[in-house]
Amino acid sequence: MRLYCLSGDLAKPCYIITFKGLRIMLDCGLTEQTVLNFLPLPFVQSLKWSNLPNFVPSRDHDPQMDGELKDCCGRVFVDSTPEFNLPMDKMLDFSEVDVILISNYLNMLALPYITENTGFKGKVYATEPTLQIGRFFLEELVDYIEVSPKACTARLWKEKLHLLPSPLSEAFRAKKWRTIFSLKDVQGSLSKVTIMGYDEKLDILGAFIATPVSSGYCLGSSNWVLSTAHEKICYVSGSSTLTTHPRPINQSALKHADVLIMTGLTQAPTVNPDTKLGELCMNVALTIRNNGSALIPCYPSGVVYDLFECLTQNLENAGLNNVPMFFISPVADSSLAYSNILAEWLSSAKQNKVYLPDDPFPHAFYLRNNKLKHYNHVFSEGFSKDFRQPCVVFCGHPSLRFGDAVHFIEMWGNNPNNSIIFTEPDFPYLQVLAPFQPLAMKAFYCPIDTSLNYQQANKLIKELKPNVLVIPEAYTKPHPSAPNLFIEQPDKKIITFKCGEIIRLPLKRKLDRIYITSELAQKISPKEVAAGVTFSTLTGVLQVKDKVHCIQPCADSVKDETISSNSAPTKEDVLKNVKYEYGSIDVDAVMKKLAQDGFSNIKLDRTGGALTLNLVNEDTVIKFEDNETHIICGGKPTTRLKLRDTIMKCLQSF
């Protein structure tokens, strides 16, 4: 069993586990920090950014690159549509992925890149809130970028990275960055998602039983338990032991794993989220008292629900209950409405409100009483009429490279009474503000990240008692600003990995489960050979399909001979008809034999150490690896059996 690490972003993981020829992707997070290298996309053309001087490298200048890079406040930005860093696709072809398991909606934003236009034929599994809220995130991203299109896309700068200043010179895999997917791609990728409930068991092609269990981080967030008859692997990503609005973490399901893969720890390990929430409320109140307005860049779901509740109560206690609050997002209406129909995914306190009856989230009450108003954009109908200052505005995108937040920065940036408060830890706030400098409005950094911190993670690992702990290497090194913060488990075997690495998981299976038919079971005659020890011989045909081993009765030809002779064959007669194959497969001989058996349009593909035969007409692929051969047949079962027999004829036997 191997683990592939396809992402260098610890908060947006993407891994692949290979086992018995099966390829399971764990999450498909999208690295969005790359957009910070680009100029913002305003709704209306900005004179400031339009008049920025071109950046010209000190040597090897290419005139065709003029206009792609702009110098702004001593930093170089790309003047083009923002681009994103995808999970690495060179380690393993996305078309070969059989299953994708998604732990939460923040870790699925690369899904359209993986499932669309790649030949992907696998299946995707997630909880209902993960699917629906993930849809909001994806649709919002597409809308934000498409509503402010760029005339052209800059590409030549990627050939000159060595000539560019930091941070562009350190851009990771810049040539692989991609512009945003289309809404059609979003719909196509989400149509492949199958919804699962907590603790529901899923048979993954006979290799694993996969079970999502609550992780306590956000609505519908899951940790995944992959179990077999002999092993238990737990994937812990984006988990929380704090009491907020989601259902609490299910720790019991994660105990005593053979392998525990842990990722998605907090991005703000040195701060307490409750403390930062209090600071946010205080800074908003001070801003309002100074006759200023507060801008809070946010995502369309998640922590923003808690901010609505906490901030409204705080303003009421401060005597500022008449201050209007606006939530602006292309999916604001859907997000607010959907959050109040998710009772089964909420904490007990929130669930109890549903049965009173009451709204689980107070923002439903605020909406009815006009304390909170929502709009798709600042140019939406009715916004200009309702908008008044001072006020509090929640809108995206937290990167400040696109979305309505760009408009508010331009409108409020020159007034020192106004403030911008960052709560999302995904983006370094000083880099976020770089293209807007000089900026008079106050900036506060109040990261609210409820995922596990290092102390909580160390405590959880001790309680779960895994045999082997698998974590990113960065988690074992002291944090730059807090040397005592790292994962330390002296009594545990720890395996670490980095982006781009392939590691072997220490699961050495000695046995596998085999099923037998009821007909064969009736013929078993156990004999006691020692006290409490019995055994029986068994003769049949071993069939392996979808990783499930099953022993079937002997071939029909043997039965026909039995009927015609009117007497039961002896054991020796049966064993004479059984052949035992051995040796290695000659692919060229297989191709010739397939042609003789009537198969045509056969294509041979060599990838690494594996050989693949594509039978185009039969919609079938035969994969030859070191110790196993797989027939992946999209056609009739009889075709698979015929191909199996043909391959067996190419082996030696006795």
From Swiss-Prot:
One of its GO terms (molecular function) is inositol hexakisphosphate binding. It is found in: Nucleus; Cytoplasm, Cytosol. Pfam families: Beta-Casp, IntS9_C, Lactamase_B_6. It comes from the Eukaryota. InterPro entries: Beta_Casp (IPR022712), Integrator_9su (IPR027074), IntS9-like_C (IPR048660), Metallo-B-lactamas (IPR001279), RibonucZ/Hydroxyglut_hydro (IPR036866). The keyword NAD does not apply. GO terms for cellular component: cytosol; INTAC complex; integrator complex; nucleus. GO terms for biological process: negative regulation of BMP signaling pathway; RNA polymerase II transcription initiation surveillance; snRNA 3'-end processing; snRNA processing. 1D-myo-inositol hexakisphosphate binds at M1, R2, T18, F19, R504, K508, R509. Keywords: Cytoplasm, Nucleus. Its main location: nucleus. The keyword Cytoplasm applies. Belongs to the multiprotein complex Integrator, at least composed of IntS1, IntS2, IntS3, IntS4, omd/IntS5, IntS6, defl/IntS7, IntS8, IntS9, IntS10, IntS11, IntS12, asun/IntS13, IntS14 and IntS15. The core complex associates with protein phosphatase 2A subunits mts/PP2A and Pp2A-29B, to form the Integrator-PP2A (INTAC) complex. Within the complex, interacts with IntS1 and IntS12. IntS9 is part of the RNA endonuclease subcomplex, composed of IntS4, IntS9, IntS11 and inositol hexakisphosphate (InsP6). Belongs to the metallo-beta-lactamase superfamily. RNA-metabolizing metallo-beta-lactamase-like family. INTS9 subfamily. Component of the integrator complex, a multiprotein complex that terminates RNA polymerase II (Pol II) transcription in the promoter-proximal region of genes. The integrator complex provides a quality checkpoint during transcription elongation by driving premature transcription termination of transcripts that are unfavorably configured for transcriptional elongation: the complex terminates transcription by (1) catalyzing dephosphorylation of the C-terminal domain (CTD) of Pol II subunit Polr2A/Rbp1 and Spt5, and (2) degrading the exiting nascent RNA transcript via endonuclease activity. This is Integrator complex subunit 9. The gene is IntS9.
